[in-house]
C-alpha cells in the first residue's frame, strides 16, 4: 500500500497537528514502512491461532458490593465552594 503526502496532511489535520514540509516527507516514508510491515504480517497464516484480547489470562477483580457506613451530606459538602441543598454545584461543562 502506498501513502502520499496528501494523506499525511489529512491525518495531521485530524490529529490537529501542524507539520513542516520536511516532517510531511519524513512521515510519509515512515508510514509507508509501517504499512509495508503490516502487509507482511497479513501474509502470515493465523488459521490455527485463537483470537485473544489479552496476552495473559485475566479475570475481573471486582470486590463484593456491600453497603458500608459513609459520611453524611453535611460533612461531604462542608468544604464545597458551592452547593445546592444536598448536591455539589459545579460550573456547566456543555453549553
From Swiss-Prot:
A GO MF term: glutaminyl-tRNA synthase (glutamine-hydrolyzing) activity
InterPro entries tied to this protein: Asp/Glu-ADT_sf_sub_c, GatC
E.C. number(s) listed in UniProt: 6.3.5.-
UniProt-listed GO biological process terms: glutaminyl-tRNAGln biosynthesis via transamidation; regulation of translational fidelity; translation
Pfam families per record: GatC (PF02686)
Keyword line: ATP-binding, Ligase, Nucleotide-binding, Protein biosynthesis
Catalytic activity: L-glutamyl-tRNA(Gln) + L-glutamine + ATP + H2O = L-glutaminyl-tRNA(Gln) + L-glutamate + ADP + phosphate + H(+); L-aspartyl-tRNA(Asn) + L-glutamine + ATP + H2O = L-asparaginyl-tRNA(Asn) + L-glutamate + ADP + phosphate + 2 H(+)
EC primary class: ligase
SUPFAM superfamilies attached to this UniProt entry: Glu-tRNAGln amidotransferase C subunit
PANTHER family referenced in this protein's UniProt entry, alphabetically: GLUTAMYL-TRNA(GLN) AMIDOTRANSFERASE SUBUNIT C, MITOCHONDRIAL
Xref: HAMAP family: GatC
Family named by the database record: Belongs to the GatC family.
Function: Allows the formation of correctly charged Asn-tRNA(Asn) or Gln-tRNA(Gln) through the transamidation of misacylated Asp-tRNA(Asn) or Glu-tRNA(Gln) in organisms which lack either or both of asparaginyl-tRNA or glutaminyl-tRNA synthetases. The reaction takes place in the presence of glutamine and ATP through an activated phospho-Asp-tRNA(Asn) or phospho-Glu-tRNA(Gln).
Quaternary structure and interacting proteins, as annotated: Heterotrimer of A, B and C subunits.
Protein name, per record: Aspartyl/glutamyl-tRNA(Asn/Gln) amidotransferase subunit C
Organism in which the protein naturally occurs: Trichlorobacter lovleyi (strain ATCC BAA-1151 / DSM 17278 / SZ) (Geobacter lovleyi)
Gene label: gatC
Amino acid at each position: 500500500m502506498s501513502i502520499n503526502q496528501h494523506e499525511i496532511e489529512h491525518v495531521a489535520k485530524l490529529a490537529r497537528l501542524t507539520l513542516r514540509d520536511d516532517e510531511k516527507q519524513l512521515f510519509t516514508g515512515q508510514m509507508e514502512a509501517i504499512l509495508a510491515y503490516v502487509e507482511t504480517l497479513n501474509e502470515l497464516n493465523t488459521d490455527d491461532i485463537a483470537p485473544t484480547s489479552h496476552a495473559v489470562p485475566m479475570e475481573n477483580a471486582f470486590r463484593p458490593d456491600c453497603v458500608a457506613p459513609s459520611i453524611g451530606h453535611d460533612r461531604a459538602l462542608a468544604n464545597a465552594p458551592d452547593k445546592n441543598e444536598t448536591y455539589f454545584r459545579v460550573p456547566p461543562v456543555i453549553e
